[in-house]
């Protein structure tokens, strides 16, 4: 029957672009956002896959470091404070997210060296005359 087109075969199940790429982040949704956002007139097929992979990697990195910060503080739940500590203590993430403010993140503990008590030079039992 000519002119019918390809059509979907009855037995085939739809496979998402995320699962094809081995990603958890939604490639289709990111593609839709890229098109809707008018970032460019046309969006290549690989662009949303690449962007989803980058976002997934950065998210996994931040969550791993924040989980370590939560464990260091003997907590089971990651809160914004742990995310703040994770980002600010990591050199590369700190540079990437330097201008970002995290709500309820607090500040890094830091005491200026001038304000710290001076260490005495003499050892035990020695007194200056």
Curated annotation (Swiss-Prot):
Superkingdom of origin organism: Eukaryota
PROSITE patterns membership: HISTONE_H2A
Key words of the record: Chromosome, DNA-binding, Nucleosome core, Nucleus
GO molecular function: DNA binding; protein heterodimerization activity; structural constituent of chromatin
SMART domains associated with the record: H2A
GO cellular component: nucleosome; nucleus
Pfam families per UniProt: Histone (PF00125), Histone_H2A_C (PF16211)
UniProt feature coiled coil, ranges: none
Subcellular localization: Nucleus; Chromosome
Entries under InterPro entries matching the protein: Histone-fold, Histone_H2A, Histone_H2A/H2B/H3, Histone_H2A_C, Histone_H2A_CS
Keyword Nucleus part of the UniProt annotation: yes
Function according to Swiss-Prot or TrEMBL: Core component of nucleosome. Nucleosomes wrap and compact DNA into chromatin, limiting DNA accessibility to the cellular machineries which require DNA as a template. Histones thereby play a central role in transcription regulation, DNA repair, DNA replication and chromosomal stability. DNA accessibility is regulated via a complex set of post-translational modifications of histones, also called histone code, and nucleosome remodeling.
Family, similarity comment: Belongs to the histone H2A family.
Subunit structure: The nucleosome is a histone octamer containing two molecules each of H2A, H2B, H3 and H4 assembled in one H3-H4 heterotetramer and two H2A-H2B heterodimers. The octamer wraps approximately 147 bp of DNA.
Name the record gives this protein: Histone H2A-IV
Source species of the chain: Volvox carteri
């Amino acid at each position: 029957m000519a002119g019918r087109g390809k059509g979907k075969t009855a037995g085939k199940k739809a496979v998402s672009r995320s699962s094809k790429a081995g990603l958890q982040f939604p490639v289709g949704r990111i593609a839709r956002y890229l098109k809707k956002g008018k970032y460019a007139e046309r969006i290549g097929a690989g662009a949303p896959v690449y962007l989803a992979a980058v976002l997934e990697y950065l998210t996994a990195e931040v969550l791993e470091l924040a989980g370590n910060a939560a464990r260091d503080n003997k907590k089971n739940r990651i809160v914004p404070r742990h995310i703040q500590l994770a980002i600010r203590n990591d050199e590369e993430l700190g540079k990437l997210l330097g201008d970002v403010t995290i709500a309820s993140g607090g500040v890094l503990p830091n005491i200026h060296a001038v304000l710290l008590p001076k260490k005495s030079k003499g050892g035990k039992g020695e007194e200056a005359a």
